[in-house]
Design a protein with these regions (language model features):
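N-terminal accessory/interface modules of nucleic-acid-binding and processing proteins
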Residues: 1-318
């Protein structure tokens, strides 16, 4: 009779080895640490490339305009890995939607906050995890996530309502200046007879400058930030951005460390998002407004309407 006892012994050894290898906490932690290190290295590379020339800088701003809720770091990572991305989700989320990632597609590496922890000095911090995402263009979905063209008048009304100060029409602005915030008057002066594009482009920039002025920041110190934020706002609102010129942008970041660069980009993102949020609230309030008004009539009404500052004052007095 053949003896098959050795099969059980071998099998037992194999199962034990498999069990031992099923999860090794130290190996897993080391792997995750390496993933984070690689992701941060990728982020620094993406940051440097974004400000390397005017084209890559514009690409970054365009991505940030599409992904307004994403951090600067993640917008930089998206711009570096797939600057045409429009809608991202991880593999499981796409699967839950009944959508499948196409074979051979490379994931887009992003960063997400992890668990809260306490540092040695007692302060609170958050760990960072690596997230693998896929754009809709990498799936079998036929859905189009491109931005819809908004109603121009509705958007302009919302922008006008978002101003933190008075808006006054004038024909006395010098040269080709379309709008100008004057701190002494706490007002934005805008040229009469402008078309929708010129109103939005110039007014959005001056609104950002006016917002900075409330915090004591001069025009000279925020003009570039306001210019870039205006580009993002134009992109989000469907206005042409072909006239924006970023040829001098790389010089502003020359010799700067990646972290410093991201700090400057944070100001651009936050400035654009502040105006976007104010516009969104204004649109919600104006859902039932008549859309047949002339653009310059909107400016006249804006002059007569209470500003955000006056509304806050009225709210305080009403309490």
């Amino acid at each position: 009779m053949n003896n098959f006892d050795d099969l059980f012994t071998a099998g037992g050894e194999k199962n034990e080895t498999k069990s031992e290898r099923s999860f090794n906490k130290e190996e897993w932690a080391a792997k995750k640490q390496q993933e984070r290190a690689d992701a941060f290295e990728l982020l620094d590379t993406a940051t440097k490339e974004a400000v390397e020339n005017c084209e890559t800088f514009r690409d970054y701003l365009l991505v940030q305009s599409r992904f307004g809720r994403y951090s600067v770091s993640n917008a930089l990572l998206i711009a570096y890995q797939n600057n045409e991305a429009t809608y991202l989700a991880d593999f499981e989320t796409w699967k839950e939607k009944g959508v499948f990632v196409q074979r051979g597609e490379k994931a887009i590496t992003l960063l997400e906050p992890g668990n809260e922890f306490t540092r040695e000095d007692g302060t609170t911090g958050f760990s960072v995890n690596v997230k693998r995402m896929f754009d809709v263009s990498q799936t079998n979905s036929q859905r189009n996530y491109s931005r819809r063209e908004p109603d121009e008048r509705r958007v302009l009304k919302a922008l006008i309502a978002s101003s933190p100060c008075d808006i006054r029409m004038t024909n006395e602005l010098e040269g080709n200046v379309c709008a100008r915030y004057v701190p002494e008057d706490d007002a934005i002066y805008i040229r009469q007879g402008l078309d929708g594009y010129d109103i939005f482009r110039s007014l959005s920039q001056e609104i950002v400058i006016a917002n900075f002025a409330k915090d004591g920041v001069s025009r000279e110190d925020c003009s570039f930030t306001a210019y870039c934020a205006s580009y993002i706002l134009c992109e989000r609102s469907g206005f042409d951005t072909g006239d924006y010129n970023f040829e001098k942008a790389p010089d502003r970041f020359k010799e700067a460390e990646p972290k410093t660069i991201r700090g400057q980009l944070d100001k651009i993102r936050d400035s654009a998002n502040e105006v976007s949020q104010d516009m969104r609230r204004a649109m919600e309030e104006q859902q039932k407004a008549k859309p047949t008004e002339d653009i310059n009539e909107l400016l006249i009404k804006a002059i007569e309407a209470p500003t955000k500052k006056e509304k806050r004052k009225a709210d305080r007095e009403g309490r």
